[in-house]
């Protein structure tokens, strides 16, 4: 018979409550020990930060869901009249939880944001058009609006970037990380993104804080538009660290483009898995060295042995 490995104190603390439900009662000495270890505001950076007061991420997420639903789906005037005050009040409450710069008031920012919703809706609509034009698998605009993670991520980004431009601290970042968690698309709220931006698939995409992306840009899964790494990263805060992507650029899956001085010229095509840390002129076609394709039969004889050509008519 197997020996009982449960500590006697823990076994004694286990009781049956509510019929067949097994409830666990934490021993008092264990509870006291853990509370003493976790309690207080001076032990770690984490505890000091929490004690100083932070945004409730659950409240942020609930507001983001409501605001993006309004941006994507709400068109009935009566529906909008009832929904807009709720969104406005939710934003007002969140702004009261952060420190705004100078004489800026939460009331003024909420009014400014509400007036910008019209243009934000127009920008998101152009993103939907770009997705439909760029993805032959799309059967209609409804599929894109409801099902495409890129549109969800861009709806959050358009709102988060607006608040970022107002100088609102922390809130836009929490919003962008929520979108990242839900879609796999990581766009910093500081990134400047032009019209008709098309993300295909999207998983694993990273766009950094100081990136500038022009109009009609198309990127695929696994693309990084990031910064180069240095030992003292804090020294670069507030400086241009991420690339500029000009109009009508296509960046294929797995490409990595790094550096604040890097500019991808208009109309360029960046091939899959390319690693770029320098600028390229407009109209460039950039590809990694073509891989060698080798196919062998069951007897080990080469059936195909050739370099893979790339069709740049794309």
Predicted feature residues:
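Short, positively charged
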Residues: 167-170, 240-244
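Terminal amphipathic alpha-helical/low-complexity segments used for targeting or macromolecular assembly
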Residues: 2-177, 301-314
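Residue-level signal for pocket-adjacent positions within structured domains
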Residues: 139-141, 158, 180-182, 200, ...
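Left-handed beta-helix
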Residues: 183, 188-189, 194-195, 200-209, ...
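Short gly/ser/thr-rich secondary-structure transition/capping motifs
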Residues: 175-187, 230-235
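Catalytic core segments in nucleotide and nucleic-acid processing enzymes
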Residues: 221-234, 238, 273, 294, ...
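Short, well-ordered coil↔helix boundary/capping segments
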Residues: 61, 236-240, 258
């Amino acid at each position: 018979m197997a020996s009982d490995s449960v500590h006697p104190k823990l076994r004694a603390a286990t009781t049956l409550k509510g019929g067949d439900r097994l409830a666990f009662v934490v021993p008092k000495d264990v509870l006291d020990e853990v509370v003493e270890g976790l309690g207080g505001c001076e032990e770690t950076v984490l505890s000091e930060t929490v004690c100083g007061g932070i945004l409730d991420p659950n409240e942020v997420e609930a507001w983001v869901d409501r605001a993006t639903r309004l941006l994507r789906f709400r068109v009935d005037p009566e529906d909008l009249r009832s929904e807009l005050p709720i969104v406005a009040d939710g934003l007002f409450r969140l702004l009261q939880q952060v420190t705004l710069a100078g004489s800026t008031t939460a009331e003024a920012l909420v009014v400014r944001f509400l007036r910008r919703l019209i243009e934000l809706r127009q920008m998101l609509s152009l993103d939907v058009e770009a997705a439909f034009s760029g993805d032959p698998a799309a059967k209609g605009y409804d599929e894109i609006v409801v099902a495409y993670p890129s549109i969800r991520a861009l709806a959050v980004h358009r709102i988060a970037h607006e608040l970022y431009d107002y100088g609102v601290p922390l809130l836009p970042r929490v919003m962008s990380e929520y979108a990242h968690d839900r879609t796999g698309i990581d766009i910093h709220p500081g990134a400047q993104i032009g019209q008709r931006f098309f993300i295909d698939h999207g998983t694993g995409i990273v766009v950094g804080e100081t990136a500038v992306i022009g109009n009609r840009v198309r990127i695929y899964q696994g693309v990084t538009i990031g910064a180069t790494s240095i030992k003292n990263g804090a020294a670069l805060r507030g400086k241009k660290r991420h690339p500029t992507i000009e109009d009508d650029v296509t960046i294929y899956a797995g490409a990595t483009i790094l550096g604040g001085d890097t500019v991808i010229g208009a109309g360029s095509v960046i091939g899959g898995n390319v690693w770029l840390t320098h600028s390229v002129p407009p109209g460039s076609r950039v590809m990694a060295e073509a891989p060698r394709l080798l196919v062998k039969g069951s007897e080990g004889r080469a059936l195909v042995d050739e370099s893979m050509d790339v069709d740049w008519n794309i």
